[in-house]
Amino acid sequence: MARTNESSPYVEFDRKQWRTLRKSTPLVLTEDELYGLRGLGEQIDLEEVAEVYLPLARLIHLQVAARQRLFAATATFLGEKHPDRQVPFVIGVAGSVAVGKSTTARVLQALLARWDHHPRVDLVTTDGFLYPTRELQRRGIMHRKGFPESYDRRKLLRFVTEVKSGAEEVAAPVYSHTSYDIIPGQYHLIRQPDILIIEGLNVLQTGPRLMVSDLFDFSIYVDARIEDIEAWYIQRFLALRNTSFADPNAHFHHYSGLSDRDATIAAKEIWNSINHPNLVENILPTRPRATLVLRKDADHTINRLRLRKL
């Protein structure tokens, strides 16, 4: 049985308990497909997909159906002509740099798109809503890139609002990790999806005004010990020397020739000055707002989950 406390808004599961909630949901991903979804350094395998992500996909599928019935009931009450109009179900995925939230979002997108009732599932990262480098420099916050103030939060809120309101086409800016900047004139076009997944560091933040998190129907926080996340970040940084950083046009190309020792020192400096403060000050405090917390162990495997019941 899952652990529950009548005074707590959460139900806690270990992986063995959670996997039973898959029921008869079929495994629809192949190893080759999973390879294409797996992020650098991630260890996710088909067993984890079956035991963690399939129950999650089933839960979200049930919630999508329930939410559509609720919207239809409200539309009928208001006397709208098309009470069966589908309203996009919006999912937020949050967590630290290097914790694996991008892989979580991609795997979830692939699984949810296999359901007949919601085949159109779009994924947008909040990187595209960072201010361009020139604007960050103008504001004197280039060193705060990734912190809440480095994002055009009004633009992100307007984007999600338009998608959820049923706009035929909404454009999301595209970010390049090679140039470390927004790509001028390039957009990811979102055309009335059944489900929209928004993935980013600070998507669960709250504030005195309407925030993008207020528009989420379901939210996930990918969690791990801070010491483990730091180790993963350093490992990823070292690996990037031979991949993204090796591109002569890459913003971080100057790191590609560093020795293991010097690259580790550089990664730790970035972690200590940017990623760790952002995690502790801004990202981690939003964890209690998540509908579901996925807790990873040091080997990247998800073995504990916490589901909000209220």
UniProtKB/Swiss-Prot annotation:
Indicate where this protein is primarily found: cytoplasm
What is a single cellular component term in the Gene Ontology annotation?
A: cytoplasm
Q: Which family does the similarity line name?
A: Belongs to the prokaryotic pantothenate kinase family.
Gene Ontology MF terms in the entry? ATP binding; pantothenate kinase activity
The family database entries (InterPro entries) matched by this protein are listed as: P-loop_NTPase, PanK, PRK/URK
Identify the EC number(s). Answer: 2.7.1.33
State the compartments where it is located. Cytoplasm
Native source species: Rhodococcus erythropolis (strain PR4 / NBRC 100887)
Catalytic activity as recorded in UniProt = (R)-pantothenate + ATP = (R)-4'-phosphopantothenate + ADP + H(+)
Broad class of enzyme this protein falls into: transferase
Which top-level group of life is the source organism from? Bacteria
The residues that hold ATP are G95, S96, V97, A98, V99, G100, K101, S102
Task: Write one Pfam family the protein is assigned to.
Answer: PRK
Coiled-coil annotated spans: none
What protein does this entry describe? Answer: Pantothenate kinase
User: Which biological process terms from the Gene Ontology are attached to this UniProt entry?
Assistant: coenzyme A biosynthetic process
| Pathway connected to this protein | Cofactor biosynthesis; coenzyme A biosynthesis; CoA from (R)-pantothenate: step 1/5
Print the keywords alphabetically: ATP-binding, Coenzyme A biosynthesis, Cytoplasm, Kinase, Nucleotide-binding, Transferase
